[in-house]
Amino acid sequence: MNKTRTLTYVWPKSIRLFHWINVITISLLIVIGLIIFNGKTLGVTVDAKIMLKTIHVTIGYIFAINLIIRLVMGFIGSSNDMWSQTLPFMKGYKKELTKFRRSPKQVYKGHNPIGKLMVLALLIAMTIQMATGLI
């Protein structure tokens, strides 16, 4: 009884690229932000601090552009890019959530109803972060 596994990508390349750009930019923003914040303790010179702030802002722009592209793709992208597949306030979500509560072991192609809530929370947090640049 040999079963052959087939690799199937649920998310298109654009979504996977969006995720990896977020991983890289958010990680860099945190590390550079901490270095800037602890500059005196770490012995960072004024010139180095200015350079780090410039790099930090540039990476912030990359993060913002990536997020804006994803927000737009939610309206004009392929089927799994669309907000109707990703966010929790679309038609049929309440039924999907009720079904999930009754049978949480159900397999979903994409996000389950709780995952959709998390996606919404992350998109809101990232949009606030992009708009303020302070978080």
Which residues make up each language-model segment?
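Membrane-embedded alpha-helical bundles that constitute the cytochrome b-like, heme-associated redox core
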Residues: M1-I135
